[in-house]
Amino acid sequence: MIDKYLKETCMLDYSNPAIQELIQKMKWKELDEFERIKAIYNFVRDDILFGYNEDDAICASKVLFDGYGQCNTKGTLFMALLRACQIPCRIHGFTIDKRLQKGAMTGLVYRSAPQNIFHSWVEVYFENQWYELEGFILDQAYLNKLQNQFPNCKGAFCGYGVAVKDFRNPTIDFNRNSTYIQSEGITQDFGVYYCPDDLLKEHHQQMSRLKGFAYRHIGRHFMNRNVKRVRQR
């Protein structure tokens, strides 16, 4: 039963040479299961920077090539690396309130964005239980800069890709626990799926063709510029 959560798919293309080369270079398969999950998690969180790709449906190897991603795309890469290293995983789909993206989204891009934005996290099967892992979305360097930008915020925070109850101490480190960074912004729950391919067949970002074109070619570049400004402060 659990074996299906190890299978390769079109989006989880872990036989891709670039992914296999990365796994060999990082020597993840030589680690015990806990350290393997933790090392892959930290790589996806901190080495794949927070940013906005052209589409949620890109494959894992494209996310690796881009070197950046958001919840859905970083999740795709995370799942591919986990499965390639014999760690069972699945995906859980949601929507989040667009207020969570304010700051990364600004001006017309924010005003024209759908109220509910497609979202997902990865669930990992380890020691006979499923862990909900969402805290890999923002790299630590970006989060640190954001915390420095809002030094007086001691409690809940919503914006710039964050929705948490404790802004100063979000649960983003995996140590046999679930991790979260956007969960306080969830508005709808679509349930769990075997792979992102299946999730996206049933649920995806609702927007017109024109808005989709504008996002891919204009909007996301403004958003990535806003993220870059936070990093440079």
Model segments located where?
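Active-site neighborhood of thiol-dependent amide/isopeptide-bond enzymes
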Residues: G51-I117
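His-Asp-centered catalytic microenvironments across diverse enzyme cores
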Residues: I2, K7, M11-Y14, I96-R233
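Functionally constrained cores in energy, signaling, and assembly domains
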Residues: K27-E30, F78, W121, F126
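Generic structural hydrophobic/aromatic packing signal, biased to beta-strands
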Residues: I23, L82, C89-I91, L133, ...
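Secondary-structure boundary elements
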Residues: M1-D66
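Residue-level signal for well-ordered alpha-helical scaffold segments within enzymatic catalytic domains
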Residues: N42-F43, A80, A84, S120, ...
